[in-house]
Amino acid sequence: MKSTRPFHPTPVITIDGPTASGKGTVAALVAAHLGFHLLDSGALYRLAALASVRYGIAAEDIDALVKLIDDLHITFREGCAQLDGVDVSNDIRAEAVGNRASAIAVHGPVRTALVARQRAFRKTPGLVADGRDMGTVIFPDAVLKVFLTASAEARATRRHKQLMQKGFSANIDDLLRDLRERDARDSNRAAAPLKPAADAKLLDTSALSVDEAVDQVLQWYRALGQPA
């Protein structure tokens, strides 16, 4: 059946899913394989969250958050996330920052302030965008939409390993509880709740290696007649 999606000359692959489902790693490797640009939308939210904490802006102060986002100087360079010219890649991965990012994302105006920045990442030859609503809200015309899933236990284990490798202390039981609470909050929020697009490919990564997940995404992309 012929697609009814609006045509856009620059292809986008969206990879959505809950926290610690592996979407960031998979997206980065798919982008590297295809030579595409990469958008880590979660990093944008975390950068805004980190800045809000540093400037003393409450998670409920919507007007101040929107103004902050409009004024932020954000850049991504060689895998590093920079805020006001300073590499904060490790800072934004702290659990407290992740929880703040999820808390401010419930506000529609805050999300609107970041949408334009996310869409601006779409450049030739293509883009791989990872996040939570890339396929449903930001790039509804993406040529391939993938939604990664994994059990809460598997995701908590992955998150614990990531944090320990970065030098953060973490309790796996606390992480599991936080993940479940964040899943419930993100799935039930009024603005762009976490859910797969109707035409998304579902990929459970609980028992898959990173390479296996990447290979599956590339197979789906090739099946569309795209070079991969």
Curated annotation (Swiss-Prot):
Where does it sit, as one GO cellular component term? cytosol
User: Keywords on this record?
Assistant: ATP-binding, Cytoplasm, Kinase, Nucleotide-binding, Transferase
Q: One GO molecular function term?
A: dCMP kinase activity
Q: Which organism is it from?
A: Burkholderia cenocepacia (strain HI2424)
Enzyme Commission number(s): 2.7.4.25
Give the family, as the similarity comment puts it.
Belongs to the cytidylate kinase family. Type 1 subfamily.
Q: Kindly report the protein's main subcellular placement as a broad class.
A: cytoplasm
Compartments, as annotated in UniProt: Cytoplasm
Q: Which Gene3D superfamilies match?
A: P-loop containing nucleotide triphosphate hydrolases (3.40.50.300)
UniProt enzyme class: transferase
Protein name per Swiss-Prot or TrEMBL: Cytidylate kinase
Instruction: Quickly give the catalysed reaction.
Output: CMP + ATP = CDP + ADP; dCMP + ATP = dCDP + ADP
A matching Pfam family: Cytidylate_kin
Asked if the Swiss-Prot or TrEMBL record annotates the protein with the keyword Kinase, the reply is yes
List each coiled-coil range. none
- Chain residues that bind ATP: 17-25
Q: Which GO terms describe its biological process?
A: nucleobase-containing small molecule interconversion; pyrimidine nucleotide metabolic process
